[in-house]
Structures are given as C-alpha cells and as structure tokens.
C-alpha cells in the first residue's frame, strides 16, 4: 500500500497536475449517472474525488459499492474545477481529484448518528457511540484546541523553570471537600485508598522537598452531584511555587493566560486583569464569579427600606436581612405579568419567598407594590436604581445569602434573555480577599471556603481562636465570563498555624494527627513560604471552544448520573473479585 502523500483538507491548487495518495472516510457519495462523486474526509477536512469511466472503469466499479463512512485509499490526479463547480466554502473547493485507483480499507454499517456538525442525534446516542461522535469536525476541532491550550501552558511553564512532576493516584482519604472515590486494598484487608480530589498535599510536600516550582496536568476525582459543568473525573492545570508573593503569582498567571488566548484562540486580551474583593463581588453581582460582560448590578435599598411604607421590605431589614434590586433597562414592555410570574418562580428556586416588581412609566411607577410608595419615596427609588421610563425593577427582601443567590441568578437569566451579553468578549477577573471559613448551620461547624491549607492574612491568624468568621484568606479565584476557571492561595507553611486552622474546623488534636500528621511533621523541617493555583482545563477549553457542555471537551465523559454509556461503567464485578478484596455487598433496598 502506497504511503499517503496529502491530507484530504490540504490538497490545494498548488498540487494541480500531481498524482496524490489519499486516505480517509467517505463523508458523502453522489451518483450522477456515469460519474460518481465522493467527499473524502480526514481530520484536516474534505476533498472531492471524481470517479470517471474515462479515467478508470475499475475504480468506478469499486466506487459503485461504496457507502458513507467506508475507509478508502484513493490514488488520483489533482485537477482544477470548472468555473461553475468552484466551492469557496471549502479549503479544497477549487480542485478535485480524478481517481485512477481505489482500495476499500474497511467497510462500514449504516451509522446510528449522522457524522456532521449539525447531527440530530440525542446526547445519549452520541455518548453511546462516542467513537463516531468524535469523527465530527466540531469535536475534532475542540480537542485540537484542548491540545493547543495544554501545549501552550506547558511551554510557558517550561520557560518559567517549572518542573512537571506526577503525584500519586492511589492516596489517602481525607474528610474535607467532596466525597472520595475509594479503592479497596487487596494486601491490607479492610483498608482503602482514595483517588485524589486534587494533588494539594503532594504539591505542598514537593515545596518542602525544595522543588520550588512544580506543575502537573493532573487527573482529579470527586464523587459529587453532577451538572453541566461538572464531571466525576476531570483535569486541572496544577501549579505551585515557593518564595512568590500573591501579586507575583497573579502576574505570572496573567502572562500565561494572555499567551493561551493568543496562541490557542487567536484573541488578544490585556493584562493586568481587573481585581475585585469577594465582598464587593457578592454585593454588586450576587456571585463570587461575576460575569462582567454586562452591567445590571445589584443595588442595596436596605437603608431606604427601613422607613418606607412597604412592610415586607421593612421587616426584612429589621430581622437582619436586606433589600436589593436590579434594573432591567428598557425591559418593562418585554415582560408580561405571566413572564414576571415565571421570574418569581425562578427566584424561589434560590430561596427567595417572592419577587417584588415595578414598571417605570412616563407618569410614574406601576405595579403591585407601587401603592406603598409616596412621591418622595418613588423619586428616591428611581434615583438609586437610575431608572427611566420603560425600565423593569425587580426586588428581593430576605437574608443576605438568599438576596445574593436569587438576584445574582436572576441577573444572569435576564442578561441572556435580553441579549445583553457580548458573546465575543473574554472578560477575565480576579476575585480576592475571600473569607477563610464558612459556617454551615446544618452541620453546626465551620468549613474551609477553599481548603484547610489556605493561609489567613497574618493579622487574622489570632481570629481563628476568637472570631473565625472574621478571618480572611490569602486566596484568589480566576473568573472568565462568569465561570470559575480556577482557584488558588498562599498556603499555610507553619505547624502552629495549621493546627489552629484544624482546630477552627472542628478537628481534635488526635484527628488532625491521624489525618494529616505527615504534613504537620513536614512543616517542622524548614518549609518555605509557598502558594499556587489550579485551573480547570476542561472548563477553560469549553469556554474557548464556545461549547456549552463540559462533556464536549472530554473524549470519553460520564453522564449526569456518572455512568459511561459506551462501556457501561460502573458495572457489577465477579464474586471472586470481591472475595479477593475481603468485601461483601450490602445493597440498599429500593424504596
């Protein structure tokens, strides 16, 4: 078999007159009575092949048996297309190949999905036949971008003298974070490894080991409830460095991301990226990952509410809550009462008891709550919300977390419905100065806002023992277009500070020693100050490739129920395997 001389999508007018050897899949076959045209596809694109009896009767006879997705080896001569046959929508649209020989390398059954970007197959069918779905050009282009992003990051970190180091996949289960995936040990009866949720502890230990600059394209595993932008196994760009300040880490990541955007996406973004404190992000956008491509910020009306005539507003503030509103500019005529009822139900999903609203008309405020406000109060509302005739004002009165969650989500929904978002923009943002701890009322304890190894501000270390809720973290998240790309922090590197952190999280001294004794001991041998960041590769590629589903950026992803439709994993295992692991199943009864 002759070697391939050209990729299908790379045959251009420069090759006219040449004999070429092509190999690929049949995208489409057209029989025009005496002539057969085949679109031959490989990962670079499509070229038109013509089977003409005047060129080769034998090749034409074979072509008559060919169907879509057959794998072919074609030999032929490149010729220019006639004027009326030129297709400027194809890179190869000015030429075609006159086939002299064709060899069917493999036949194909009729495929269960259409191999085209506009396939009508459901996602379940696409996942079951993922190897066919991956043939679609849009899928290949997504994974080409993933490769380009990873390559650019590796090259950048190499120039910055980072070492790529692999850390263990079989490790120890720790109590913080999401549920672990557990792996039973055959050698140690009744004991389990855990698959890593991140390489956090190992990368810190590499800093203890004097490596100074580490990175890894790391596989991570979390047994958590899934959604469109979550998978049980995912990939993160894991980075750690010694002796760098927070500003130095952020500046380096900005240089890396501007290079990724330019090299992998062809888009110039400017640095430094804007920075916003966590408290400001929550106050202005109701989100710790604000989408700054459009405005519509939350406005605090709590002071106004104290003296207003609407008791719902007044009582919310008196009970320690707040009143906030958003102004959907020019949207009054676009939302009927029924539409606003739908927005109300949407807000309730996020804990709001209801959604108050007003429409601004030329002669004043209209709506169910307009009667509660006199002329002076109406003017204050209009001024605070920068309202004009035609605007729709939406209010939530509740505890602070509910106000932020509901109005933040409502803001995003309205941004999409009103087409306020410029989809061509890439808005990066650093969210800094996070709270170190978050209190969970159900569990009646504090949890780490990021993880238990995050360094507090130096002046806040003592607050861990006196007022943990006031302690701030030297932590930072990188946000792109309303998605958290990744998070990082400076790390605790002194044993006494780490022990205070564990105590604030409710660990007894014995529990801390049992779970993290190896780390605490490491901190006694001259641990350098260090910090880092982990960026979600799957999510970054999703945003750059313009996909809406994380599964489209992972070659063989899981469904929302964490199953693989292709291999049918997870699956039962043989009784003998369980016995070898000293395991016995106790299945939950179906309700």
Swiss-Prot record:
Indicate the annotated site residue(s) for Important for tRNA non-discrimination.
84
Entry annotated with the keyword Disulfide bond: no
Query: GO biological process annotations for this chain's record?
Result: aspartyl-tRNA aminoacylation
One annotated GO molecular function is:
catalytic activity, acting on a protein
- Record's Pfam families? GAD, tRNA-synt_2, tRNA_anti-codon
Kindly list the positions annotated as binding ATP.
222-224, 231, 484, 536-539
Q: Which CDD domains match?
A: AspRS_core, EcAspRS_like_N
Q: What is its main location?
A: cytoplasm
Q: Organism's domain of life?
A: Bacteria
Give the E.C. number(s). Answer: 6.1.1.23
Alphabetical UniProt keywords: Aminoacyl-tRNA synthetase, ATP-binding, Cytoplasm, Ligase, Nucleotide-binding, Protein biosynthesis
Any one of the GO CC terms: cytoplasm
According to its UniProt record, where is this protein located?
Cytoplasm
Residues that hold L-aspartate according to the record? 176, 222, 450, 491
Region listing for Aspartate, in residue ranges: 200-203
Q: Which NCBIfam families match?
A: aspS_bact (TIGR00459), PRK00476.1 (NF001750)
Q: How does it assemble?
A: Homodimer.
Function summary = Aspartyl-tRNA synthetase with relaxed tRNA specificity since it is able to aspartylate not only its cognate tRNA(Asp) but also tRNA(Asn). Reaction proceeds in two steps: L-aspartate is first activated by ATP to form Asp-AMP and then transferred to the acceptor end of tRNA(Asp/Asn).
Family membership noted in the UniProt record:
Belongs to the class-II aminoacyl-tRNA synthetase family. Type 1 subfamily.
What's this protein's name?
A: Aspartate--tRNA(Asp/Asn) ligase
Q: Which organism is this protein's natural source?
A: Bacillus mycoides (strain KBAB4)
């Amino acid at each position: 078999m002759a070697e391939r001389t050209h990729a299908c999508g790379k045959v251009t007018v420069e090759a006219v007159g040449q004999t070429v050897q092509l190999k690929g899949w049949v995208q489409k076959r057209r029989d025009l009575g005496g002539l057969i045209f085949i679109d031959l596809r490989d990962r670079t694109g499509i070229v038109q092949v013509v089977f003409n009896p005047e060129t080769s009767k034998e090749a034409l006879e074979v072509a008559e048996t060919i169907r879509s997705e057959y794998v072919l080896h074609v030999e032929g001569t490149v010729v220019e297309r006639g004027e009326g046959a030129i297709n400027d929508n194809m890179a190869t649209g000015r030429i075609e190949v006159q086939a002299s020989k064709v060899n069917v390398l493999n036949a194909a059954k009729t495929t269960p999905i259409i191999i085209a970007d506009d396939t009508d197959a459901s996602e379940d069918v696409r996942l079951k036949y993922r190897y066919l779905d991956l043939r679609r050009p849009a899928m290949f282009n997504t994974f080409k971008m993933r490769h380009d992003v990873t390559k650019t990051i590796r090259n950048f970190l190499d120039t910055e003298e980072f070492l790529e180091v692999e850390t263990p996949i079989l490790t120890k289960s720790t109590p913080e974070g999401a549920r672990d995936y557990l792996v039973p040990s055959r050698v140690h009866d009744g004991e389990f490894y855990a698959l890593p949720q991140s390489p956090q502890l190992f990368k810190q230990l590499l800093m203890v080991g004097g490596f100074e600059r580490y990175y890894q394209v790391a596989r991570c595993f979390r047994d958590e409830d899934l959604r469109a932008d979550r998978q049980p196994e995912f990939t993160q760009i894991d980075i750690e460095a010694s002796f760098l300040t927070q500003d130095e880490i952020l500046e380096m990541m900005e240089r890396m991301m501007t290079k990724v955007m330019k090299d992998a996406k062809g888009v110039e973004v400017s640095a430094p990226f804007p920075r916003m404190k966590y408290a400001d992000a929550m106050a202005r956008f109701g989100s710790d990952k604000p989408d700054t491509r459009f405005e519509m910020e939350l406005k605090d009306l709590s002071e106004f509410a104290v003296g207003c005539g609407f008791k719902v507003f007044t009582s919310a503030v008196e009970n320690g809550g707040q009143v906030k509103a958003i102004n959907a500019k020019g949207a009054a005529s676009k939302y009927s009462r029924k539409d606003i009822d739908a927005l109300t139900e949407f807000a309730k999903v996020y804990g709001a008891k209801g959604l108050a609203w007003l429409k601004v008309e030329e002669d004043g405020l209209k709506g169910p709550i307009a009667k509660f406000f006199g002329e002076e109060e109406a003017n204050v509302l209009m001024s605070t919300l920068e309202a004009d005739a035609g605007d729709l004002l939406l209010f939530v009165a509740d505890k602070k977390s509910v106000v932020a969650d509901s109005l933040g989500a409502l803001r995003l929904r309205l941004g999409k419905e009103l087409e306020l978002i410029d989809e061509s923009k890439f808005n990066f943002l650093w969210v800094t100065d996070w709270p170190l701890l978050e209190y969970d009322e159900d569990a009646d304890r504090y949890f780490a806002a990021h993880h238990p190894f995050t360094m507090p501000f130096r002046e806040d270390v003592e607050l861990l023992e006196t007022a943990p809720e006031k302690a701030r973290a030297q932590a930072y998240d990188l946000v792109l277009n309303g998605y958290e790309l990744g998070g990082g922090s400076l790390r605790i590197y002194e044993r006494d500070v780490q022990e205070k952190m564990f105590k604030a999280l409710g660990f007894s001294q014995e529990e801390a020693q049992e779970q993290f004794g190896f780390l605490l001991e490491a901190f006694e041998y001259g641990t350098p100050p260090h910090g880092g960041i982990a960026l979600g590769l799957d999510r970054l590629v999703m945003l750059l490739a313009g996909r809406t589903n994380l599964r489209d950026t992972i070659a063989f992803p899981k469904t929302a129920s964490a199953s693989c439709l292709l291999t049918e994993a997870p699956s039962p295992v043989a009784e003998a395997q369980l016995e070898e692991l000293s395991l016995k199943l106790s299945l939950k009864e179906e309700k």
